[in-house]
Regions:
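Juxtamembrane intracellular "pre-TM" segments in multi-pass secondary transporters
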Residues: 2-11, 191-228, 250
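Helix-to-loop junctions at the C-terminal end of transmembrane segments
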Residues: 67-80, 272-286
């Protein structure tokens, strides 16, 4: 029997999932510090045009994720988590290779489409976590998963910024090596976590994005939680979508400074998720913890909308760490409303919602920023995206307060 056939309680199961999510996050964040100047160099574009190109790039990546996420989630329910995660890792490695070789804006966009297609592994990865943890422990474990994502946000942008001195594409070669190493690790040591009796045939109706949404619509309380998650996803995307552009337009930061700023945010959020999330959820409950996190996030968004100095920006990076309560709390609320056989589909639904939010985000956040940093704008206001994010978060808080309190299926 191969190591892959080992029991799901094998310590390699959770370890591999954490590394995979870390690499997914790193792949998402790797390009952030170098993206503005990479687009300006490759496309010979001014900053406002590069912001606009970045919006189209984000839309293409989000559309790919929107399609792929529920497919991967349902495939993981039918085939098991192991096969789907290994395929996604192979695709992630291909994505890094394309970005490393990119010599045009079109190639960069194509590389980000691959990121969207194979970044949908977040859903199957979370489903694997649900397979091997009890319902009462899931909020804490999802907090650890979110911490892995936060660490990826540290490693990705920091690596992108630090290696940018060796060229725009150097970070992608480093990430390619890491992705291939994790693929080999999973191929040999990652066990299957989904029991055969809990698998179900692949369904095209469930695998399309709107079929996944029907799952939420049919379950008590799940629809509103899904809508809250969608609003939160749109608002929280203000950082990955606009931060690098905002830092250049508002504060004149270098690629290295942008990478270090992402690293600081990632460190504070990861520490918060490890040491605060589990305790806060147990003390406050999932709903109240999510509300508290969103209130802190909205205050941070307003602060960045008005920020005019590096010192204030640095202080806000530490203060916004409380937003780490939101994602794991909402994910735990969704997971509680699904049975064991639905966990892959529910996590696919969550990933689909994130993909849909990523489609809305570039239009709602990045496009206005491109306008308010262009010569045609009546005022120069790079912080417009943060102001919009604050309003969206306030709407999410209001909607969550109306969600039924039932916590089980």
């Amino acid at each position: 029997m191969s190591p892959a056939a080992a029991d799901a309680r094998n310590p390699h199961a959770l370890r591999f999932v954490m590394i995979t999510i870390l690499l997914d996050a790193m792949g998402f964040g790797l390009i952030m510090p170098v993206l503005p100047r990479l687009l300006m160099r490759v496309g010979s574009l001014p900053l406002d045009a590069a912001i606009n190109a970045g919006a189209w790039m984000s839309l293409a990546m989000a559309a790919a994720s929107f399609i792929a996420a529920p497919v991967l989630g349902n495939l993981s329910d039918a085939l098991g988590r192991r096969k789907v995660l290994l395929i996604a890792l192979a695709g992630l490695a291909a994505n890094y290779l394309v970005l490393a070789l990119a010599g045009s804006v079109a190639m960069i966009i194509f590389g980000r489409v691959l990121t969207g297609l194979f970044g949908g592994s977040y859903g199957p990865a979370q489903a694997a976590v649900a397979d091997i943890t009890s319902p009462d422990d899931r909020a804490k474990t999802f907090g650890m998963v979110s911490a892995a994502f936060g660490i990826g946000f540290i490693a990705g942008p920091a690596l992108g910024g630090l290696l940018s001195g060796w060229g725009d594409t150097a970070p992608f070669y480093a990430a390619l090596a890491l992705a291939l190493a994790n693929f080999l690790y999973g191929l040999w040591l990652f066990p299957e976590t989904l029991k055969p009796e809990l698998r179900r045939p692949f369904s095209l109706a469930r695998a399309n994005p709107f079929g996944a949404w029907k799952t939420a619509a049919a379950s008590q309380g799940m629809r509103r939680i899904a809508l809250v998650l969608l609003l939160w996803q749109v608002a929280s995307l203000v950082y990955p979508l606009t931060w690098s552009f905002w830092a250049i337009a508002q504060l004149g930061w270098s690629d290295q400074m942008i990478g270090l700023s992402f690293a600081l945010v990632g460190i504070t959020i990861a520490l918060s998720q490890v040491f605060l999330t589990g305790r806060a959820v147990k003390r406050l409950g999932e709903r109240n913890a999510a509300q508290l996190g969103m209130i802190g996030a909205a205050a941070g968004f307003i602060g960045y909308a008005l920020c005019g100095s590096t010192l204030v920006a640095g202080l806000l990076m530490v203060a916004i760490a409380i937003q780490s309560l939101v994602q794991p709390s909402l994910m735990a609320m969704l997971s509680r409303r699904a049975d064991a056989a639905q966990q892959g589909e529910i996590q696919g639904l969550a990933a689909m919602i994130m993909g849909l939010g990523s489609i809305i985000g570039p239009v709602l956040l990045v496009k206005p920023m491109a306008w308010f940093t262009s010569p045609a704008a009546p005022i120069h206001f790079p912080g417009i995206a943060f102001a919009i994010a604050a309003l969206v978060t306030i709407g999410a808080i209001a909607l969550l307060r109306t969600t039924p309190r039932r916590e089980t299926v």
